[in-house]
Design a protein with these regions (language model features):
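Surface-exposed helix-capping loop/turn segments at secondary-structure junctions
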Residues: 75-78, 170-177, 222-231
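Short, polar/flexible loop-turn hinges at active-site or ligand-entry regions and domain interfaces
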Residues: 48-50, 148-151, 227
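Catalytic phosphate/metal-binding cores of nucleic-acid and nucleotide-processing enzymes, i.e., regions
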Residues: 49, 180-182, 239, 246
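Polybasic (Lys/Arg-rich)
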Residues: 202-242
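Metal-dependent nuclease catalytic cores that hydrolyze phosphodiester bonds in DNA/RNA
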Residues: 1-132
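Short cysteine/histidine-rich zinc-coordinating motifs and their immediately flanking basic loops
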Residues: 43-44, 247-249
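Mg2+/Mn2+-dependent nuclease catalytic core
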Residues: 100-215
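Cys/His-rich metal-chelating microdomains
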Residues: 35, 242-245
Length: 249
């Protein structure tokens, strides 16, 4: 296990020309301003989590499958099944946007008023006959329940998509408010494993509203320019853990 250390790089200072800010850091700020400040200003990151190799494998295979139809400029059969009039978007920057090059940046744009370079790694983009882009995100899951976007934790999925929509509009693309989630649901009703998982694909649409993104960036800027810790979110498990530990030390 890696020894935990205070990070000295990629810290915010009061007068940066630009400061890189990933989509996940925006979500961290919304979850808990204090954790965000500790991470970006003081270099105390939240404890790391293990990766999700099975989810990554699903993403990789879905990208390969949709790339086949991208080359043909034809809709994937499931797009036809759901009546989606679009094809996978063919663009020379797609490998950068979805980080096939492993630079850990993705699509990015600078918000001029804050100096934040907002970054996000997408899974896919589809384009309509009218030239509108649809942001697409792949999600791997395993549930016997109906696939939906109404669970509490899936609100973060919606914010994720809306940030991507915001980025691509700022880059200069015509972006549809309608994005798509492609859920790959691993089925557990099989009798035996037989060295394979079987998945069922479901597409859910989300009508995004990115009007909250810029105001949130302004609030993040204010927090980072303060010299005092912001209040913790009472619902933050990390902060509550630290508080309870202090009580018994």
């Amino acid at each position: 296990m890696t020894k935990y250390k205070q990070r000295k790089r990629n810290l915010y200072n009061d007068n940066p020309d630009t400061y890189a800010l990933s989509r996940s850091k925006i979500d961290m700020f919304l979850d808990c301003p204090r954790c965000f400040y500790l991470d970006r200003k003081l270099g105390f990151s939240q404890p790391s989590m293990p990766g999700w190799p099975l989810n990554s494998a699903v993403d990789h295979l879905l990208k390969r499958e949709f790339d086949h139809y991208r080359k043909l400029q034809q809709p994937h059969p499931i797009m036809v099944q759901y009546g989606i009039e679009a094809v996978p978007f063919l663009h020379p920057d797609l490998p950068i946007w979805r980080d096939d090059v492993y630079h850990y940046v993705g699509a990015s744009v600078v918000e001029e008023q804050t100096g934040f370079q907002v970054q996000g790694i997408i899974d896919d983009i589809w384009v309509s006959p009218q030239g509108e882009l649809h942001i697409v995100d792949y999600k791997a899951t395993s549930t016997a329940s109906e696939i939906s976007l109404e669970d509490e934790y899936k609100q973060a999925y919606k914010r994720q998509m809306e940030i991507y929509q915001w980025i691509f509009r700022r880059i200069g693309f015509k972006v549809s408010p309608v994005g798509y989630f492609v859920f790959a649901n691993a089925l557990k009703d099989r009798t035996f494993f037989e060295n394979k998982l079987e998945f069922e694909l479901t597409i859910l649409s989300h009508y995004g509203d990115d009007s909250w993104v810029s105001p949130t960036l302004f609030e993040m800027k204010k927090v980072l320019e303060c010299d005092t810790l912001p209040d913790a979110n009472p619902e933050c498990e990390y902060c509550e853990y630290r508080r309870l530990i202090k009580e018994v030390e």
